[in-house]
């Protein structure tokens, strides 16, 4: 199918996991794709897999100045952006007693502050119409231990689906939140926790929460992202789509 033919699309955090799977699907649907990531080697590996036409841009989502530079680079190279997927994230999970200010700021800067200022910087490039997809987390729906700051940062991000949809209604820019449940990705495998036993225990605890009894697959999120990026979702804004195995509702 060619549901994204002619569309210029940006995926942050596109070198692995859900972002990479989404880039594959966007390309298969005819989109022109740019991906970002912090790690140059991973970006180059992703480009080798995705093809020479994919634009790779090294960028640290937590750095506001780098987000402004990213927007400036895209503005020079592309005529517009038809869809943006804010996917890059810091998934650090820690007990409430173990958080310090530096780790708190890193998670908030990556998951909320950086994305907000990227959106701001991209506004002149966003097409009419445009779809902006914000990657949330089902942890905002439940009381998952150790997810306090991660879930809070994602709740802040997804609140933009409503506030910015309302504010930018005249521009025909639609913001929606795509909410993954526990998904089999590299991020899920480490959770930015250094204690291997703690990681294993937390992974088991998370998997046990899923009514369907398994982790999600990145392609399952990617298919939902294609829908939100396409004209098929043109009557949707300010809302959430949960692809979570039932965690948030059952």
Where would I find each of the regions flagged by the language model?
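Substrate-binding pocket helix/loop in short-chain dehydrogenase/reductase
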Residues: 95-96, 100-108, 206
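Active-site helix of classical SDR
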Residues: 119, 153, 161
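Short C-terminal tail/terminal secondary-structure segment
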Residues: 226, 237-250
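Active-site loop immediately N-terminal to the catalytic Tyr-X3-Lys motif
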Residues: 97, 129, 142-148, 170, ...
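Residue(s) in the substrate-gating loop at a strand-loop-helix junction
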Residues: 137
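Conserved glycine-rich cofactor-binding loop
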Residues: 8, 15-17
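Alpha-helical segment proximal to the catalytic Tyr-Lys
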Residues: 124, 166-170, 234
């Amino acid at each position: 199918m060619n549901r994204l033919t002619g569309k210029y699309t940006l995926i942050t955090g596109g070198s692995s996991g859900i972002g990479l799977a989404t880039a594959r699907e966007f390309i298969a649907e005819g989109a022109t794709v740019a991906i970002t990531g912090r790690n140059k080697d991973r970006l180059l590996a992703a480009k080798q897999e995705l093809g020479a036409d994919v634009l790779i841009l090294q960028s640290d989502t937590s750095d506001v100045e780098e987000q402004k530079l990213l927007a400036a680079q895209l503005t020079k190279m592309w005529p517009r952006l038809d869809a943006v997927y804010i996917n890059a994230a810091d998934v650090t999970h820690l007990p409430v007693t173990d958080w310090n200010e530096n780790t708190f700021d890193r998670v908030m800067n990556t998951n909320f502050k950086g994305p907000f200022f990227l959106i701001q910087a991209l506004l002149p490039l966003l097409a009419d119409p445009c779809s902006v997809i914000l990657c949330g987390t089902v942890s905002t729906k439940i009381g998952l231990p150790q997810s306090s700051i991660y879930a809070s940062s994602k709740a802040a991000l997804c609140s933009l689906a409503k506030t910015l949809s309302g504010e930018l209604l005249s521009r025909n820019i639609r913001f929606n939140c795509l909410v993954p449940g526990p998904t089999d990705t590299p991020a899920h495998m480490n959770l930015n926790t250094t204690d291997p036993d703690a990681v294993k225990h937390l992974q088991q605890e998370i998997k046990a929460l899923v009514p369907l009894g398994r982790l999600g697959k990145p392609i399952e999120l990617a298919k939902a992202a294609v829908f939100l990026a396409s004209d098929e979702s043109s009557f949707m804004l300010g809302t959430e789509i949960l692809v979570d195995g039932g965690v948030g509702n059952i």
